[in-house]
Design a protein with these regions (language model features):
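Feature detects amphipathic, helix-rich regulatory segments
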Residues: 1-190
Length: 190
């Protein structure tokens, strides 16, 4: 990003407008999830418990299980407490999140993958490491990010990042299968 013009060096064709610097609190309503015991969730999605529950863990992108109710839809979450404080994700669809997740709800702009990635690239720098690492709501609200002024450009970037994430996940699964196969092959020889 060029400092003076606020125009990215690389971008999709057809976009020429400058990007703008905005505080998170100007773009979103900042809130957080609610306490939910893990015993109230299921490990797999069921008809009775169809909504994903996200927590502060990194396993399965923070997926703790599934629950009967949802709190939010199409929003950005971040881990507020613990070793993963400052990890930011876009959550498509309806979901529940625990009290160790902050939530950004669409207000001025639509929550999407592009904005989640922009925040994820800077959020760790705002984590307080005094005692238990934390990134509280008031701190997240004051973070300034640069975003395209045009909603269409934000959506195109969001779609690009979502496709890239899906491709990475696919390759990780393939790599896991390959490594598992190789390990089993070596064990059979011994």
């Amino acid at each position: 990003m060029e400092e003076k013009k606020q125009v990215p060096q690389i971008r999709f064709k057809g976009y020429v407008d400058t990007w703008e610097q905005r505080k998170v609190s100007e773009l979103f309503r900042v809130t957080r999830g609610y306490v939910l015991a893990a015993t109230q969730t299921e490990t797999t999605k069921t008809d009775e418990k169809p909504y994903p529950v996200y927590s502060s863990q990194t396993k399965d992108q923070g997926l703790m299980g599934y629950y009967k109710d949802y709190l939010y839809e199409d929003a950005i979450t971040w881990t507020t407490d613990g070793a993963n404080a400052g990890t930011v994700n876009y959550r498509a669809g309806k979901f529940y999140c625990t009290n160790v997740c902050g939530v950004l709800l669409s207000n001025e702009v639509k929550a999407n993958q592009m904005i989640a990635e922009a925040l994820n690239s800077v959020a760790k720098g705002y984590v307080s490491y005094v005692g238990n690492p934390k990134l509280m709501n008031n701190v997240m609200a004051d973070i300034v990010i640069q975003i395209p002024t045009q909603a269409e450009e934000r959506e195109q970037l969001s779609s690009f990042f979502a496709k890239l994430d899906n491709l990475i996940t696919l390759h990780q699964r393939e790599l896991y299968k390959y490594l598992r196969y190789q390990i089993l092959k070596v064990r059979r020889k011994s």
